[in-house]
UniProtKB/Swiss-Prot annotation:
Species assigned in the record: Staphylococcus aureus (strain MSSA476)
Location of the THUMP domain: 61-165
Keyword tags: ATP-binding, Cytoplasm, Nucleotide-binding, RNA-binding, Thiamine biosynthesis, Transferase, tRNA-binding
Name of the coding gene: thiI
Name recorded for this polypeptide: Probable tRNA sulfurtransferase
GO cellular component: cytosol
């Protein structure tokens, strides 16, 4: 079947009332960005849905795949745009039926957005079903459990006919909900947390704490790859890599061993808080899950949060670990997340970390050294990378450079 349009259904944009135009415009921009590099199509965004007009050479499968990854899109259907005559509709219905298997069953489903169309829903179903049955003697109607369902939408401008409905990612268009800073560790949880807030229309930049030589270049490349996977859905993402060795060593030098984990995370939050103000973000996002590890109890979260007045969003707070793993696999980050490269959260881990840290104690331990200068130095020396969906890792770049130098 040669389709001439893609019908794109909006997600929660239908609930946005007077703000809908803003959301539709943002979604159109996101669609154009996602489809960059492809040709043979024209994007037409309307108030209640979007149409992608296809030329003969358009790569419909690639376009549909990319659209399915965009937040704010509920579903996509390859459609035939048909004139508003029963003759044109019947001819299109027969085209669909030509693709059916022998002895298969079908159903006609009609929706009439144009209530002035001269035929009602039942009449259209009967006429189109009858046209198919007259043309083929080896297929039949089954309205309850059909093998095929030809869907017909009668709209003001034309008739749209289709069979397939490809699920989209739902949610809201990224860019409509402000900016946040994602604390990206390299584990399973934080990429999922990032994906969850992006699904609510939020733009993200990511921050990663790197502690060489205790953490390797492979750990850094792992985080770059996770960012690249997230960028496949939303376009380029800035990744801020913080040199954290000095701070982490100093924490382990002056803080009681049972409190080093709490204090380390407080230092991370202080660095993140400064960066939030530099980039104009409105919140910090992390992958914390209540009770999962010692640093993620309510007592720990209270002690860690206390260093910032910036809102901290925890999309995975109440998830089961298995739920997070399932989502990680769905979004394509799981296999990268489980690569066995240590991050700064796993080095210097005390044997018996405190699970209910006393806030006054952690402040007392940290008070013996003025960390502010180290924190400012870490922020000043942040390495910022812009990660795109086709970003090459450091190793790949070095290999390509060696090849070019050799040639």
């Amino acid at each position: 079947m040669k389709y001439d349009h893609l019908l794109v259904r909006y997600g929660e944009l239908t609930l946005k009332g007077s703000n809908r135009k803003k959301f539709v415009n943002q979604l159109r921009n996101n669609v154009n960005k996602s489809l960059k590099g492809l040709d043979g199509f024209v994007v037409k965004g309307k108030r209640d849905r979007m149409y992608i007009e296809l030329e003969d050479h358009a790569d419909i499968n690639e376009i549909t795949y990319r659209l399915s990854k965009i937040f704010g899109i509920k579903s996509i259907s390859p459609v035939l745009k048909v004139e508003k005559t029963i003759e044109a509709m019947s001819a299109a219905a027969i085209k669909f039926a030509q693709q059916f298997e022998e002895n298969s069953t079908f159903k006609i489903d009609v929706k009439r957005a144009d209530k002035n169309f001269p035929m009602d829903t039942y009449e259209l179903q009967r006429e189109l079903g009858g046209a198919i049955l007259k043309h083929f003697d080896n297929i039949s109607v089954n309205v309850k459990r059909p093998d095929h369902e030809i869907r017909v939408e009668v709209r003001l401008d034309a008739i749209y006919m289709y069979e397939e409905v490809v699920p989209g990612s739902g949610g809201l268009p990224v860019g409509t909900g402000g900016k946040t800073l994602l604390m990206l560790s390299g584990g399973i949880d934080s990429p999922v947390a990032g994906m969850e807030v992006m699904r609510r229309g939020v733009t993200i930049e990511a921050i990663h704490f790197h502690s060489p030589p205790f953490t390797s270049d492979q750990a850094k490349e792992k985080v770059i790859e996770l960012t690249r996977i997230l960028a496949e859905r939303v376009g380029p993402i800035k990744l801020h890599i913080v040199p954290f060795t000095e701070l982490q060593k100093q924490v382990n030098k002056v803080v009681h061993p049972r409190y080093t984990m709490t204090s380390t995370r407080r230092m991370m939050m202080r660095v993140a808080d400064k960066l939030v103000h530099q980039i104009g973000a409105l919140a910090i996002v992390n992958g914390e899950n209540l009770g999962q590890v010692a640093s993620q109890t309510l007592h720990s979260m209270y002690a860690i949060n206390n260093v910032t007045s910036t809102p901290v969003l925890r999309p995975l707070l109440t998830y089961d670990k298995e739920e997070i793993i399932i989502k990680s696999k769905e979004i394509g980050t799981f296999e990268t997340s489980i690569q066995p490269f240590e991050d700064c959260c796993t080095i210097f881990t005390p044997k018996n970390p405190v699970t209910e840290p006393n806030f006054d104690k952690v402040v007392q331990y940290e008070s013996v050294f003025d960390f502010e200068e180290m924190i400012n130095r870490a922020v000043e020396n942040i390495e910022t990378l812009e990660i795109t969906s086709d970003y090459k890792t450091i190793k790949e770049q070095q290999t390509n450079q060696l090849i070019n130098d050799f040639l």
